[in-house]
Design a protein with these regions (language model features):
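Short glycine/serine/threonine-rich phosphate/pyrophosphate-binding segments
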Residues: 16-18, 117-119, 142-144
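Glycine/GP-enriched mid-protein hinge/lid loop-to-helix segment characteristic of carbohydrate kinases
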Residues: 2-4, 20-22, 30-32, 41-42, ...
Length: 201
């Protein structure tokens, strides 16, 4: 496998971290996931990711020189330097994801908001192929959104251009109760279903 070039893709979620090994033409070679360790405000998440990628490189007998880098989607605003300033779902405050991953893996790391990079992926290889303007909504532990305009991600003034999950939708409820994420995320649906079951509905 050393002659061909590869890259890794990582989607960090509040429940699980999904990873993929890709050939440099975008072909998926293998995918897997690991649980998201939220202990100690997510302090072990990046080292868990690095360890899993290193294990995969060893399993495949790959030379490190055959890996172009790793792309990482984070469920929160990310600035142009790959720094996350707050990520509620993971318990992170300001975290330099790019610098930390590059130090752990000795590989280039490219970091973006998860919904933004998902929207970009849909434009290149998914349901948005052939379109240069699109909006993508992601539903998981929270609700996210990615906006592509003229083929480019709309980042907004603070990296939260598509963060529709934090829109306040109900004026009579305090944050975060009035947020879209609170009302529509899969985690809220599970809580509501569990509450309904326990009350005999």
């Amino acid at each position: 496998m050393d002659m061909q070039k590869f890259c890794f893709g990582v989607d960090i979620g509040g429940t699980s971290i999904k990873m993929g090994l890709f050939a440099n033409d975008g072909t998926l070679v293998e995918k897997w996931s690991i649980p998201t360790d939220l202990a100690e405000n997510g302090a072990h998440i990046l080292s868990d990711i690095a360890g899993s990628i290193q294990e995969k490189i060893t399993q495949k007998g790959m030379a490190l020189s055959s890996v172009l880098g790793v792309g990482i989607g984070v469920p929160g605003p990310v600035d142009e330097n790959g720094v996350v300033h707050k990520c509620v779902n993971l318990g992170w405050g300001t975290t330099d994801v790019k610098q930390k991953m590059e130090a752990l893996l000795q590989l280039p790391a490219f970091v973006g908001n998860d919904a933004n990079v998902a929207a970009l992926g849909e434009m290149f290889r998914g349901g948005g192929k052939g379109f240069s303007n699109l909006v993508m909504v992601t539903l998981g532990t929270g609700v996210g959104g990615g906006i592509i305009l003229n083929g480019k991600i709309v980042h907004g003034s603070n990296g939260a251009g598509g963060e529709i999950g934090h829109l306040h939708m109900r004026d009579n409820e305090p944050e975060p109760c009035g947020w879209v994420t609170t009302a529509a995320s899969s985690s809220m649906r599970r809580r509501q279903a569990s509450s309904g079951c326990s009350s005999g509905i």
